[in-house]
Amino acid sequence: MRRVRYFLLALLVAILAALAGGYYWLHSGNPDALRKIVLQQCVPHQQQQQNPSPCAEVNLKGGYVLFKDRNGPLQYLLMPTYRINGTESPLLLDPLTPNFFWQAWQGREIMSQRHGAPVPDNAISLAINSRSGRTQNHFHIHISCLRPDVRAQLDKDAAAVSSRWLPLPGGLQGHEYLARRVTEAELAQRSPFLMLAEEVPEAREHMGRFALAMAQQSDGSLVLLATERNLLTLNRASAEEIQDHRCAILNANH
């Protein structure tokens, strides 16, 4: 009987994996589209003509670009100027690699510029999806609005967030999340990818399973959010799920 149960469980996992893979290929289009835009258009245009187009900004010294995503009025992507696939890349655990989350947070002003009015920090979120939760194979951090319901939940559970990675009560969007508080000074000094790899057991060996997000807390500190792929709970580890690219939170703040 036990052998049958194991077989059925293995079969279920295989089916879920196939479904997840099918979803990925169905929605991915060309998974190298962003990489081609960055490496074949934005970077050469900046180098040769001092024009970042079609990117909004190319920072050659910092090793990143900012690119307006086609989804939503204010969503931007921060991407490296060289090849990095995603959260699974060993380069992200190299201390010499740029601190992309810090750069993305520093670049959030571009949302206000496009909006034509200040976008409050508590309405902004950063997110990078896991290997199974993304559709593009070039590293990209989504800079976009936070979902209003996620904002409310983070405010409600603020007391449960500490300087250690701990489960966020109730998770987010039906998925389990770990949360860790950081200050801007800490974020400037140390990459969240290193914090995750060095502080969460077994994370270093399986970084590609994780998605990371960040938002501001009500006290002005920042909260890092991490979720791990779990096919049994249909969690593809897409931290972008905490974002609202339509930016309804800006209407709620009026």
UniProtKB/Swiss-Prot annotation:
GO terms for biological process: CDP-diacylglycerol catabolic process; phospholipid biosynthetic process. SUPFAM superfamilies: HIT-like. InterPro entries: CDP-diacylglyc_Pase, CDP-diacylglyc_Pase_proteobac, HIT-like_sf. The keyword Chaperone does not apply. It comes from the Bacteria. HAMAP family: Cdh (MF_00319). Belongs to the Cdh family. This is CDP-diacylglycerol pyrophosphatase.
